[in-house]
Amino acid sequence: MIQTDILIIGAGPTGLFAVFEAGLLQLKCHIIDALPQPGGQLAELYPKKPIFDIPGYPSVLAGDLVTNLMEQIKQFQPGFTLGETAETIEKLEDGTFIVTTNEGTKHQAKAIAIAGGLGTFEPRKPILKDLEFYEIEDRGVEYFVKDPEKFRNKRVVIAGGGDSALDWTIFLKDVAAEVTIIHRRTQFRGHPDSVQKVMDMDAQKDIQLIVNSEVVQLKGDAESNHLSAVGIATDGTEELNWVECDYFLPLFGLSPKLGPIADWGLNIDKAAIEVNTFDYSTNVPGIYAIGDINTYPGKLKLILCGFHEATLMVQSAFKRIYPNKNNVLKYTTVNGVQGF
């Protein structure tokens, strides 16, 4: 039985930073994550993607941010149960919780922080004939950009109208031989600055932007079994426009799934856990939810916001674990950081 003060479910940036904040209060943490390594989406889906809205970092690669967070929390010696999924929870008479994973690993904790990002995440896929054929063995359909160098000097078609599609269009412009972005509408859902950059790049013929259109067919090379072109249908026209490509990236976002946590008796709204913004507690005393997995009025799914939520959550968890202790806020600039 693994015993800890706070059991954190999810080893993404929010969960990792919660370890640091807990360590400042001398609270021990243990983290469960279904992935084989810490970092969540940052490490698994886009480690080479630059992030621009972390305070103090004009730009930082997602993978480097994870590395820095791991270095920051090392002094607090967190435990990890990786490659396993939290399945069942039991609340004991003393107020502690027993969480058991799909592999049977048991954890006892005085507080639970669910920081699972989107839970188990799967890409939203277009409905296309032969899609599964081109998904396997590097045949041309990709849903994530883990290593941009894979697309060096290649012809890339991106479909989507959100931040992910826009960001990778901008980034791959200087990597790929050709970049085409296709959106079924004229209005984009992404950040206005990114939208303007893509518009400007199209005007300068650095990329090709095709709107009011969607990919409806895939074509491959008979000898290599690799994707060679996508067929595009445009509103108001009957003929397909074929664009030759080496890779097709349908970036329509992720489908969030809470998995077994959905059966833990928590108030849930559209696959997100409802919380009180005072301390990011759920309707079950002792269980908190922080990061992208929670929801509340005005919620912003930003790493920065997750850090804030983790900080307030830990303060509340301390009061729950040590109800008779006074917690005086200490500044690290004055007191430094004392590890375990």
Annotated model-derived regions:
Residues M1-I9, C29, Q37, G79-K154, ...:
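FAD-binding core/adjacent interface of flavoenzyme oxidoreductases
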Residues T4-I31, W168-K173:
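N-terminal Rossmann-like FAD-binding beta1-loop-alpha1 element of flavoenzymes
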Residues G23-E44, T180-G190:
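Glycine-rich FAD pyrophosphate-binding loop
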Residues P36-V60, H191-V195:
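Conserved N-terminal glycine-rich FAD pyrophosphate-binding loop of Rossmann-like flavoproteins
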Residues I73-T101, K106-A109, K173-T277, N326-T332:
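A Rossmann-like FAD-binding core segment of flavoenzymes
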Residues K129-K150, Y247, L251-L304, L312, ...:
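FAD-site-proximal beta/loop scaffold in flavoenzymes
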Residues R152-V175:
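Rossmann-like NAD(P)H-binding beta-loop-alpha module
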Residues W168, I293-F340:
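A conserved FAD-binding loop/helix module that cradles the flavin
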